[in-house]
Structures are given as C-alpha cells and as structure tokens.
Amino acid sequence: AAGGSGCGAVMGSKNLKAVILDDTGCTPVEAKDKAKFREAVGALSKAILADPLGPAMKNIGTPVLVMMINSFGCFPTKNYSLGQFEGAEKISGEYMIELMKKRPNAQPSHRCMEGCIVSCSNVYTDEKGEVIVSGFEYETIGLMGSNCMIDDIDIIAHMNRVCNDVGVDTMDIGGAIAVAMEAGLLAWGDGKAALSLVREIGKATDRGVMIGNGCRFTGEKLGVKRIPHVKGQCLSAYDPRGLKGVGVTYSTSPMGADHTAGLVLPNPGNPSYNPGSPTGQGGPSQFLQTCMAGMDSLGLCMMAGMPLLDPVPQSTLISCVSAFTGEPLDENYLANLGTSALKAERKFNDAAGFTEKDDRLPRFFLEEKLPPSGNIFDVPEEEIDSVNRF
C-alpha cells in the first residue's frame, strides 16, 4: 500500500490510479565497466549475505523482531502505555512460521522481486491455502496487534489485507485503532470489531473516513490526548523511551516518525552504545539517517542497506556505483548523497512552515514512565536540534 509516505493520499486526492512507464524506444542502460561492476556486485552480495541477521530474515522475516523488541521492553502495547505484551508469542514470527508450515501454499521465505538475495518477505495463507496477504511485516503486527492488545495473528493479517486493498498504511491505521480504543469506541483486544472498523474505510462510513485519515486525525476527532505521532505520522513499532536513538530519528526525520529513516538499535559491533542513555543518541541517528537517505536515493532496499553501514561493505557499494556510472567516487559519496537528500527534504519542510517545535515527540513520552523499565524519553532538546541541521 502506498500509504506511509503520503503518496497514496496525494494520488487519491488527484484521482490518479497508477503511473505507467513505457520503455518503448529506450536504450538499455549498461555498466560502463562491466567487469568491475560484476566483481563489485559479487562482493556486495557476499557482504549482504554475511550479515548476522541474514538467516533470521530469510527464515522468519521482519516478524523475528517481535520477541526481540518485546524482550527489550519497547514493544508498543495498549497505545504505547506498556513496553511488553503478554500475548507476544501468539503474534511472533516464530509462531507465524509454525502456522505457515501447516498451511497449503504458504511461503515463509519469499522474494518480493526477482533477483532478491535476502528473501525476507512471505506469503501468508489461511487454513484452506487461500492467500490472505503477502508481505506480512513486523510493523503491521506491532501496530495492529500488541498496540491494540490483539493477539489473533489471522485477524491482524486480514486487517493488513484490507489496508492493502484500500491503499492505506497499516502502521497509521493500527495507531488510529488504538487511539479509538483508548477513546472507548471499541474494546481493547477486540480483533473482530477492529477488522470490521478497518473494512469501513473502503465503505466511506463516518467512522471509516475518520480511521482512514490516520492516527492523528482520529485522536483529535475523538479528543484523545495521547496520540503517538510526529508531524502527523504515527510512530513505528519501537517505543522511543527504551530505544532513544529511534526517538531522535522519529523527532527529526523530515517525513515524521519513520523507523526506516534511521533505525538505531543495539549493535554487537558497537557494545559501548547504550540505547537507554539520554545522551549520545544524536550522533548515531544522524549517521543512520544520512546513510539511509543515500541508500534510498540509490534505490536500495533497507534490508540490503543495513548490512552496508560498516566501512568495508560501504566502500564496496561505492565501487559498484562507480563501475556502473564510470565516474570516480570517493569514500564520502554515500554520505554526501544522503546529506543532499536530507537538505532538500528539510528545505521543503522549512518552506511548508515546519520549525524545531515540530521535531518533538508527544509530551506523554517525556512524562509517562514506560513499564516495565520505568524509562521516559529524556534526550536533551539541544541534542535533538543538532540533527539534520546542515
């Protein structure tokens, strides 16, 4: 669904259904140095496959994060009022895979496009082998599952399917359902009622239009004070009180709360990094945001991009681009590319009237302690304001 970035909303407002590219008469683009390009691509593939998370992504996909983030105490639960969900195992990647092994036509590991070497996607089916959804991801499970206290993975998959069909973001709709539950519109954990509500989006009922407009709109309409959004976009499935670098990314990303902009997680390669410290979060967020903006500009998938953050794999990526374009590129190429993209995004936001006041998490993350850790988001404002200010 073209929902998370707002692309679907813009297209819908213009009654634009599709963009069709006709390559008739176009000359195929080929690498300038084919031999060096093949060599660099081979090295790049090895670097991606050597990533420690690689086997888990291939065998389980992003839902492998459910139990991991739940164990960190940062799994959004009951509209971000808790950091752990008692029903986490019932919606975990491991449980999902066991179900899929028993179901006809299910594919626990699936390439979302030809040539992918990560294969982190999947095809999730029902007991009869009918496809419910393909690309059943961690973020959907977190926002539509634990965040709404729903522990029925099939119900979550069906909600995912409906969101795909009507072209809305599962994270923002999950956030909208949770704030609606907080307002008393439906009961916590009532999966059937939640699925029925999501189906109303396509029917354009009053409730459906409200939910379809997302988390912030729904919360404001219902008078809910605890609305988990930045710049109008719902937070992802990582509570920023426990993963404070992610909170900095949520705050400062030009797009709003966006984990893909720079997901700052504990890294075995950097044991000194403390995700719960109030200081030292701006630097990691800035580094990742710059790298990911560069990789986005190159059209790289995030799952392939994350293993390329270290200097050696990153130099291999730069060699790959250099061999393709025929242009000499230095070690700062990716950082410069990312910085250029972030500057352009920031310039747009400045022109649209956004200020530093918009680079903030909702107050409740700063004031309410997150069980079970008792953490609050307490990164100093001056550290937040140092990010993406070029």
Annotate each language-model stretch with its function:
Residues 1-7, 11-390:
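Extended C-terminal regions of large enzymes
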